[in-house]
Regions:
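Structural recognition of the conserved hydrophobic beta-strand(s) that form the central parallel beta-sheet
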Residues: 99-105
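Conserved catalytic segments around the Walker B and adjacent sensor/switch elements
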Residues: 26-40
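Accessory nucleic acid-recognition modules appended to NTPase machines
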Residues: 184-358
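Single conserved hydrophobic/aromatic residue that forms the stacking wall/gate
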Residues: 1-8, 12, 360-368
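Hydrophobic positions on the alpha1 helix immediately C-terminal to the Walker A/P-loop
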Residues: 18
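Conserved P-loop NTPase "ATPase switch" module shared by AAA+ and STAND
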Residues: 66-82
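Interdomain motor-coupling "hinge/lid" segment immediately C-terminal to the ATP-binding subdomain
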Residues: 112-231
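Short glycine-rich substrate-engagement loop in P-loop NTPases that contacts/grips substrate
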Residues: 38-68
Length: 368
C-alpha cells in the first residue's frame, strides 16, 4: 500500500495526474475517489472495517470493477475520511491482494492529531516542489544540466550569465508545478504570480481546518512573519517578531502545525559541529523556511521584475531567497539531515550543515 504526502496544491491536479497515470500504465482499471466533500464515502469506515463491504462501496462509487492485482484503488484526500488512515492496516491484513494508493494534503497534520498510517503496512512517499534540476529539464535545458553535473568549471564559468538568468527565473517561479507550467506556456510573470497567490489563498483556507479560530489566527501570524524573519541578518526565529512580548508557548503549536502540513521547514541550530549532528541540536534556536522559493517571493509581495532583473531585491533580502533556495534543493535529496551552526557571539555562522555520510558545510552568497 502506497501513501503520498504532498504540500497543498502541489498541486491537486499534478498529484492526481501522477497517481492516475501510474494506474493507467500498470493496471487494467483505476478506481479513483476524491474523499474531500464526498458524502457518499465520508463514513465508509465509521461502523467497521469489513473489507468485503468497503470494496463493494468503492466499486459502486468509482464505477470500476475491483479486481485483485488488476485494479488500483486511489483514495485522494484520505485525511478527510474518518478512520481513513487507520483503514490501511485492514486493507493490508484482510485484503492484501488488493492494491491501494492514498494521498492527502494535510496528512502530516492528521498524523500529529492522532490518526497515523500503520507502521510497516504502508510505503510513504513525500512529494516536493520541482527542484532546479527538474526546472532545467522542463525548460529543455538538459545539455546545460549535464554541464553542471560534470563540474566542468571552465565551461560553467563561460555560461555564467545564462545560468544566472535561469536561476533568477527559478527564484521567481519556484517549483510548484502549476506555476512552472504557466511560466513555460505563457512566459507571463504576472500570470505566474497570480497562480502563486491562488496557492497562498488555499493555504490560508487550510489554516482554519481542524483547529480552533484562535489557533488558526496564530498559525496565520507565524506564516505571515516568515518573510521578515528571513530578511534579518540573523535569521533565527524570534517569537517577539510575530507579536510583541510573545513567548514560545504562545506559538509553538502554530509552528508545529505549519511543519506538519509541509508548508514550512524548521531547521535547528547545533551547538557544536560534530557527528551525528542530532547530538548537538539546540531545540530553542531554529529558523523557519518556506516550502518553495517562488512562494516566498509571492508571500513577500516582491515585484516580479525585481526578482527577474534587479539585484537590489536580492541584496536587501539579506540572502533570504538564496538560503530558502539552497535548503529546498537539499531537502529534495534523500537522507540529508540539515541544521545550521552559530557561535554564541554571533560572529561565526554556517548557514547549513548537511549530514550525509560526512558533514558538508554550506555558506551562501547574497545573490545569484
Amino acid at each position: 500500500h502506497l501513501s503520498i504526502r504532498r504540500q497543498r496544491q502541489m498541486c491537486i491536479r499534478d498529484r492526481t495526474y501522477i497517481l492516475q497515470e501510474f494506474g493507467k500504465q500498470e493496471y487494467d482499471h483505476v478506481a479513483y475517489i476524491n474523499c474531500d466533500g464526498n458524502s457518499e464515502i465520508a463514513n465508509i469506515f465509521a461502523e467497521d472495517y469489513d473489507m468485503k463491504r468497503v470494496l463493494m462501496v468503492i466499486g459502486a462509487i468509482s464505477k470500476q470493477p475491483i479486481i485483485p492485482g488488476k485494479t488500483l484503488i486511489i483514495l485522494d484526500e484520505i485525511q478527510e475520511l474518518h478512520k481513513g488512515l487507520s483503514s490501511l492496516k485492514y486493507f493490508c491484513e484482510n485484503a492484501p491482494e488488493y492494491h491501494v494508493a492514498v494521498a492527502g494534503s494535510l496528512l502530516g497534520v492528521a498524523m500529529h492529531q492522532g490518526e497515523s498510517a500503520p507502521v510497516g503496512k504502508v510505503d510513504i512517499i513525500r512529494l516536493y516542489p520541482m527542484s532546479f534540476e527538474e526546472f532545467l529539464m522542463a525548460k529543455d535545458e538538459e545539455q546545460l544540466l549535464n554541464i553542471l553535473k560534470s563540474k566542468d568549471w571552465k565551461t560553467i564559468t563561460l555560461l555564467h550569465d545564462k545560468l544566472t538568468k535561469i536561476l533568477r527565473e527559478y527564484y521567481f517561479v519556484g517549483g510548484m508545478p502549476e506555476a512552472v507550467k504557466t511560466y513555460l506556456a505563457t512566459n507571463d510573470a504576472n500570470l505566474v504570480r497570480q497562480v502563486q497567490n491562488n496557492i497562498l489563498t488555499i493555504y490560508r483556507s487550510d489554516m482554519s481546518k481542524h483547529v480552533s479560530p484562535n489557533e488558526a489566527t496564530r498559525i496565520s501570524m507565524v506564516w505571515q512573519s516568515i518573510p521578515s524573519q528571513l530578511a534579518k541578518e540573523n535569521k533565527k526565529f524570534i517569537y517577539g517578531a510575530v507579536r510583541s512580548g510573545a513567548r514560545a508557548k504562545d506559538f509553538e503549536m502554530a509552528i508545529q502545525w505549519l511543519v506538519d502540513a509541509g508548508l514550512t521547514y524548521r531547521i535547528s541550530r547545533v551547538r557544536e559541529v560534530g557527528m551525528p549532528l542530532k547530538f548537538y541540536e539546540d531545540l530553542n534556536a531554529f529558523k523557519l523556511f518556506l516550502l518553495d522559493v517562488g512562494l516566498l517571493g509571492a508571500l513577500s509581495e516582491m515585484e516580479p521584475a525585481q526578482m527577474l532583473i534587479s539585484n537590489k531585491a536580492m541584496t536587501e533580502s539579506k540572502g533570504a531567497f538564496t538560503e530558502n533556495y539552497v535548503l529546498t534543493q537539499l531537502l529534495c535529496q534523500q537522507d540529508i539531515y540539515t541544521y545550521y551552526y552559530s557561535r554564541g557571539d554571533a560572529r561565526l555562522e554556517i548557514d547549513f550543515l548537511a549530514q550525509h555520510l560526512s558533514l558538508i558545510h554550506i555558506s551562501e552568497p547574497t545573490r545569484p
